[in-house]
From Swiss-Prot:
SMART domains: Carb_anhydrase (SM01057), FN3 (SM00060), PTPc (SM00194), PTPc_motif (SM00404). It comes from Homo sapiens (Human). Glycans are attached at N109, N113, N156, N359, N444, N619, N631, N722. Residues 349-448 form the Fibronectin type-III domain. This is Receptor-type tyrosine-protein phosphatase gamma.
Length: 1445
């Protein structure tokens, strides 16, 4: 019987589902990177830049401290009177007879494969390698094009052009730059010589269709997403990127729009724009830039990369004199927001409509001017209002001058009437704007009417609403707020009215009798409204094309899946497809607006929804019915509203008269019928498209379409009214649809009965199986059990967490998506992983891009919901509005008794599977102050022992996480008392040990065998060197961090809690690396792609950027090649012995390690600053120079190039990432640079290790004598004392003390200089090497800033001192050493330090000697007050590696 019922269950489920489900349009949520709409008011790329002491050329940016207003400090020309860009006023531009047709040469040819595109960090530039020439248009000669640059705005077609025409700006501006090839060989040379250059400005305007000519450019943009990326472009025709007609253009003389702002540019600004679709436009908004801070890189979206417009001053703007080029109206070329020419509207609609009562008989209507004006100026506003009373319909219209306040007072208002208001802007020649939102007002309740929905926005009549009640639901076209007013109705009207240009008004909409009853009328009091009540514009060509694939119903529009906030989100006409195609990546964790920052603005957000419904709200005097109330059913069936005797059901019909299903998320018996009178306008519209397809009757339903538990759906008796589709025709008889309805209902009822029987039987079987398990679902069998069954998988199956009976239910039916499980077949053997990564890196990292796109798409078709996160009671608990917790995998807290227990189980956290372990991790956001108690409650309830934190509290001036632990002593968070026990600081991370105690659990209570269950230990591993939306500079420290935090987990503890700021990007990267390291150890295979796709189904956006995805592979490659090299001190002798034994090929592991130390990835050792011509003479040895990532920068001197460079590198120590600075012995002409470095970086210790004594006296001594100070402009250097310190072998260290005094203020810096003898000394015992190290370590404890170490070249001696210092500190603190990591990190940060295997072998010898000294009881050597060494080592000077081993 069971074998028979198992397949029946699936067949019946699919059959029933397919009969009631419908088409759904999905919208991707805003990602962490998608900062777009959240920061539109900010100019620039949202990068908050701190003033840096190091930079290359004069640094500038589009915002912040180096923004346009500060450009003049480094480029004086930026303050000139003839600057660009400008706003061009067409009416003041004169026609210049000298400006005739442009002559283009080569523009019609396809570009060669040498043309390439580069992300410069400020823009995206195309470097033209072919010959493109321009003449005419008043240019002084024949000019050659060299490069193309782009400027764009923030998001979604917002203004981004630099120039504007009549105040109108465009989404993108393309600029083509030219130079005179007869005079110069390059564009840059012409600029440096300050000679005339040319520039074309071409505007891009949004269009409903893709522009195929832009395809090579858009494809190229996807290859240069990150800063400094370059790619070759597919062939394109440059002429196709220009307007179709080149006759209409403006000419003026201006400047470059970026520093140096040279006023040498002859500008040609084309009047006609080039079309670009929203989908293509998204490629610009996905571009990243980087901000370098010290040697940590942060990644930001590059947006708003345009300069503010400048004054025209005494310049004249001219127009071309090409005949007939200026005849057309401007709207033929400057398209309306929907991208069609059919809509000749004056402006966008007036916004911010409000209706407020002044007294008992008067109302005030207010609005704001339109956001965009196509035909300025606005002359006046037309205010229309209509009302209905006792079936009499009236309407009045009056005008209001635009120069007065935008308010109107309506007198003699009756409290018993329903009023509808709308406003329209009127320009010259009686051109009018779109209508504003239609506001419905009755008594003290205001509602917005738009399309198929009515939303209330009024004020309370009984009691004030709570802040949660007034919180907006989502952004969109309507506002949904509540104020405690009893409100229970549904409007299912779809308006199709006239265009704004003045055609006759027709209305295809009716408010149901239920609506009127909800507004105070008796049932059925009004059957329809006059045809002039709700006129809206006829759909444009763009919307028609959208609706061709999705016909509009008279009863309801198609529903949409949840948008960023989980609400059903419809598309606006002309925008829907493009919005639906937004790339998930267009978002920044870093760029998002945090919830707490926007609390004040929440009331201005709007909700997108294609579902016609209204949430039933109650004031404090009306009790809310419970789910068990007889007034409604629990599972979304008929819902009876008090005051209505009966619910009626209507099935709408499609155009062909066949049965039409309700929208997704709505059962057919929940659709409200409305009367839609047939009109000629609709008939013409529907019949005008011969290719319009019929709507299929069956579509998959989106389980994401949900309603709150207070939503009620009311139906109206269809017998009273006719129903109509988009085409006018006689209404069908009542029996035509009642008989099929009865048949279908009967079949559905029979199927449901059978389905319930199957479910009961199925559940009974599962209960028998799971007997003995406390949870509803059985635990997934171990990998061994699955292997015995022949279905062994690489990872555990997806786990879903069923609602507890005590948890609040937001929706009646919570669906569980079917999630695929990664297979062992996808795993890559470790031996092939190196080759695999090489393939991914090939072809400009194309393999990584393809993989990550697959990751982004993997959850697109899964209807995974996050309704609890979107619930109004929980929204304030989310740090970011678009980072939500999936319902099926969310961590549920135990509800708190009493205090709002209904929603106290929510926290923005999800269980995430690990390698062969379900729920191995909890991925969560950085706690908000308001969620500290929930955070620690979750840690207690989940028995978490390890917290992994991968964010700093503040990054780039923005709050990323609140400090949820006490700085010292104890702090109480709800019932949990947290005590800080210890803090250990490392170079890249910090470890904190907490004791947590639950005050509600008593010591030794029953069931507590240990007697101390009320107190636990929690360890926090906090990584401090990982930038938001970016990746760490080096993989080795991350591997150490992951391994140590993973090893600290105890078997009896619960999941590891991992969080960053949003809990997705860096959190996901950590989880993947940790799990893959475990898989490598267990099976010697790797499956990054499969595992990431799997965990993406458990929390959204895990591993947020492609850069993070690449970093995972880099880190795993490092782990595979280097293996684990950390060794405890008691095993060091045997370990060294093992790596000295030759292998099969005759090579020892020591040799293999050293090869990895010296072979570094090219991207880590870029040294282009050191190789500049102006800096080459500052290097003693060209083979020992700083890598760009770790280069020490100087504060540049004003007006002098290259003054920021010095041959010096940061080196990571044990306690700080910049603990040391290794540099060369100063050259005579770099001595002042050396002291500037000390001054800039507050260094207080200098260790001088001369490799030989061959330096001349004047070169050897770079410090001043006692008699005379050294003047370094901003400060002076004075020698104040000189001492000597004797070592055990009678060698001496000469100690100089200097004072650096500022010339402008009282700041003083004390510096101690150690002039050391030859070190390490080959004639002395190896163990004596640590004498000098101990002296330096002890001195460093009392001083701040990095320790500067130098030998002649800044190479092996200095590197050896840093390495041994770090390793000795590691040995003291951890009783373990990692020679390989320390040596490789030094070579990564300063290439060329260790070049000989004997140098690497010496480090092992020294550490063996130090370990032997500790084992023999001789602790570290110290120095007494007089400088004498208290413990001297008398070891044999002939120590060798063999003897040490």
């Amino acid at each position: 019987m069971r074998r028979l019922l198992e397949p029946c269950w699936w067949i019946l489920f699919l059959k029933i589902t397919s009969s009631v489900l419908h088409y759904v349009v999905c919208f991707p949520a805003l990602t962490e990177g998608y900062v777009g709409a959240l920061h539109e008011n900010r100019h620039g790329s949202a990068v908050q830049i701190r003033r840096r002491k190091a930079s290359g050329d004069p640094y500038w940016a589009y915002s912040g401290a180096y923004g346009p207003e500060h450009w003049v400090t480094s480029s004086v020309s930026c303050g000139g009177r003839h600057q660009s860009p400008i706003d061009i006023l067409d009416q003041y531009a004169r026609v210049g007879e000298e400006y005739q047709e442009l002559q283009l040469d080569g523009f019609d040819n396809e570009s060669s494969n040498k043309t390439w595109m580069k992300n410069t960090g400020k823009t995206v530039a195309i470097l033209l390698k072919d010959d493109y020439f321009v003449s005419g248009a008043g240019l002084p000669g024949r000019f050659k094009a060299e490069k193309v640059e782009f400027h764009w705005g923030h998001s979604n077609g917002s203004a981004g052009s630099e120039h504007s025409i009549n105040g109108r700006r465009f989404p993108v501006e393309m600029q083509i730059f030219f130079y005179n090839p007869d005079d110069f060989d390059s564009f840059q040379t012409a600029i440096s010589e300050n000679r005339i250059i040319g520039a074309m400005a071409i505007f891009f305007q949004v269009s409903p269709r893709d522009n195929s000519a832009l395809d090579p450019i858009i494809h190229g943009l996807k290859g240069v997403v990150h800063h400094e990326k370059e790619t070759f472009l597919d062939p394109f025709v440059l002429r196709d990127l220009l307007p179709a007609s080149l006759g209409s253009y403006y000419r003026y003389t201006g400047s470059l729009t970026t520093p140096p702002c040279s006023e040498i540019v002859e500008w040609i600004v084309f009047r006609r724009p080039v079309p670009i679709s929203y989908h293509q436009l998204e490629a610009f908004y996905s571009i990243f830039t980087t901000e370098q801070q010290d040697h940590v890189k942060s990644v930001e979206y590059l947006r708003n990369n345009f300069r503010p417009q400048q004054r025209l001053h005494d310049r004249v703007v001219s127009k071309s004199a090409v005949r007939d080029s200026w005849n057309h109206d401007m709207t033929d070329f400057l398209e309306n927001p929907l991208g069609t020419e059919a809509s000749k509207v004056c402006s966008s609609p007036p916004i911010h409509m409000k209706v407020q009562p002044l007294n008992q008989t008067a109302l005030q209507v207010s609005w704001s001017q339109p956001e965009t004006i196509y035909h300025p100026p606005i002359m006046n506003y037309m205010i229309s209002y209509s009302w209905t009373k006792n079936e009499d319909e009236k309407e009045k219209t009056f005008t209001k001058d635009s120069d007065k306040d935008l308010k109107a007072t309506i007198s003699h208002v009756s409290p018993d009437s329903l009023y509808l208001f709308r406003v329209q802007a009127v320009c010259r020649n009686d051109m009018r704007s779109d209508f504003s939102q239609t506001m419905l007002f009755q008594a003290n309740t205001t509602r917005i009417f738009q399309g198929t929905r009515i939303v209330k926005t009024g004020v309370p009549t009984a009691s004030p609403a709570s802040s949660a009640d007034m919180a907006p639901i989502s952004s969109g076209s309507s506002t949904w707020t509540s104020s405690g007013i009893p409100f229970s109705f549904v409007s299912m009207a779809t308006g199709m009215g006239p265009s704004s240009s003045g055609s006759q008004a027709t209305v295809a909409s009716v408010v149901t009798s239920t609506l009127l009853a909800g507004l105070g009328f008796g049932g059925g009091g009004i059957s329809s409204f006059p045809s002039t009540v709700w006129p809206t514009r006829l759909p444009t060509a763009a919307s028609a094309s959208k609706q061709a694939a999705r016909p509009v119903l008279a009863t309801t529009e198609a529903l949409a899946s949840p948008g960023p906030d989980g609400d059903s989100s419809p598309t606006k006409d002309g925008e829907g497809t493009e919005e639906g195609e937004k790339d998930e990546k267009s978002e920044s964790e870093d760029g998002e607006r945090e919830h707490e920052e926007d609390g004040e603005k929440d009331s201005e957000k709007k909700e997108k929804s294609g579902v016609t419904h209204a949430a039933e709200e109650r004031n404090q005097t009306e009790p809310s019915p419970t789910p068990s109330s007889p007034n409604r059913t629990a599972e979304g069936g008929h819902q009876t509203i008090p005051g209505h005797e009966q619910d009626h059901t209507a099935v709408p019909t499609d155009q062909t008269g066949g049965r039409r299903d309700a929208g997704p998320g709505l059962d057919p018996d929940m659709v409200t019928s409305t009367q839609v009178p047939p009109t000629a306008t609709e008939e013409q519209y529907a019949g005008s498209d011969p290719k319009r397809p019929e709507m299929p009757s069956k579509k998959p339903m989106s389980r994401g379409d949900r309603f709150s538990e207070d939503s009620r759906f009311i139906t109206v008796n269809p017998a009273e009214k006719n129903t109509s589709g988009m085409i006018s025709r006689p209404a069908p008889g009542r029996m035509e649809w009642i008989i099929p309805l009865i048949v279908v209902s009967a079949l559905t009822f029979v199927c449901l009965i059978l389905l319930i029987a199957v479910l009961v039987y199925w559940r009974g079987c599962n209960k028998i199986k799971s007997k003995g398990f406390p949870r509803r679902f059985r635990e997934v069998p171990s990998s061994g059990e699955r292997g015995e069954k022949g279905s062994r998988k690489c990872f555990q199956t997806a786990h879903f967490y069923v609602e507890d009976s005590s948890s609040p239910r937001v929706v009646p039916n919570e669906s569980i998506p079917i999630i695929p499980i990664p297979d062992d077949m996808e795993a890559i053997p470790v031996k092939q992983f190196v080759k695999h990564i090489g393939e991914l890196y090939s072809n400009n990292q194309h393999g990584f891009s393809e993989d990550f796109e697959e990751v982004q798409r993997c959850t697109a078709d899964m209807n995974i919901t996050a309704e609890h996160s979107n619930h109004p009671e929980n929204k304030h608990k989310n740090r970011y509005i678009n980072i939500l917790a999936y319902d099926h995998s969310r961590v549920k807290l135990r509800p708190l008794p009493g205090k709002d227990s209904k929603h106290s189980d929510y926290i923005n956290a999800n269980y995430v599977d690990g390698y062969n372990k379900a729920k191995a991790y909890i991925a969560t956001q950085g706690p908000l102050k308001s969620t500290f108690e929930d955070f620690w409650r979750m840690i207690w309830e989940q028995n978490t022992g390890i917290i992994v934190m991968i964010t700093n509290l503040v990054e780039k001036g923005r709050r990323k996480c609140d400090q949820y632990w006490p700085t010292e002593n104890s702090e109480e968070y709800g019932n949990i008392i947290v005590t800080l026990k210890s803090t250990k600081i490392h170079a890249c991370y910090t470890v904190r040990r907490f004791s947590i105690r639950n005050t509600k659990v008593k010591k030794g209570q029953k069931g507590n065998p240990k007697g101390r269950q009320n107190e636990r230990v929690v360890i926090q591993y906090h990584y401090t060197q990982w930038p938001d939306m970016g990746v760490p500079e080096y993989a080795l420290p991350v591997l150490t961090f992951v391994r140590r935090s993973s090893a600290a987990r105890m078997p009896e503890t619960g999941p590891v809690l991992v969080h960053c700021s949003a809990g997705v990007g860096r959190t996901g990267t950590y989880i993947v690396i940790d799990s893959m390291l475990q898989q490598i150890k267990d099976k010697s295979t790797v499956n990054v792609l499969g595992f990431l796709k799997h965990i993406r189904t458990q929390r959204n956006y895990l591993v947020q950027t492609e850069e993070q995805y690449i970093f995972i592979h880099d880190a795993l490659l490092e782990a595979i090649l280097g293996k684990e090299t950390e060794v405890s001190s008691n095993q060091l002798h045997s370990y060294v012995n093992s790596i000295l034994i030759p292998g099969v090929g005759g090579k020892t592991r020591l040799e293999k390690q050293f090869k990895l130390v010296t072979q570094c990835n090219a991207k880590y050792v870029e040294c282009f600053s050191a190789q500049k011509e102006c800096n080459k003479e500052k290097n003693r040895n060209s083979s020992v120079v700083p890598s760009e990532r770790a280069r020490v920068g100087l504060a540049p001197l004003p007006g002098m190039k290259g003054t920021d460079y010095i041959n010096a590198s940061y080196i990571m120590g044990y306690y700080r990432s910049n603990e040391f600075i290794i540099t060369q012995h100063p050259l005579p002409h770099t001595t002042k640079d050396f002291w500037r470095m000390i001054w800039d970086h507050n260094a207080q210790i200098i260790v001088m290790l001369p490799d030989n004594q061959s330096l001349a006296e004047d070169e050897f001594v770079y410090w001043p004598s006692r008699e005379e100070s050294m003047n370094c402009e901003a400060f002076t250097v004075t020698l104040i004392s000189k001492d000597r310190l004797c070592l055990s072998n009678e060698e001496q260290i000469i100690i100089h003390d200097f004072i650096l005094e500022a010339t402008q203020d009282d700041y003083v810096l004390e510096v101690r200089h150690f002039q050391c003898p030859k070190w390490p000394n080959p004639d002395a015992p190896i163990s004596s090497t640590f004498e000098l190290i101990n002296v330096i370590k002890e001195e460093a404890l009392t001083r701040d800033g990095p320790t500067i170490v130098h030998d002649e070249y800044g190479a092996v001696s200095a590197g050896m001192l840093c390495a041994l210092t770090t390793l000795s500190q590691q040995l003291e603190n951890e009783n373990a050493v990692d020679v390989f990591q320390v040596a490789k990190m030094i070579n990564l940060m300063r290439p060329g330090v260790f070049t000989d295997i004997e140098q690497y072998q010496f480090i092992y010898k020294a550490m063996l000697s130090l370990v032997s000294t500790k084992e023999n009881g001789n602790g570290p050597m110290t120095v007494d007050k007089n400088g004498a060494v208290l413990i001297a080592d008398e070891s044999d000077p002939a120590e060798s590696m063999e003897s040490l081993v």
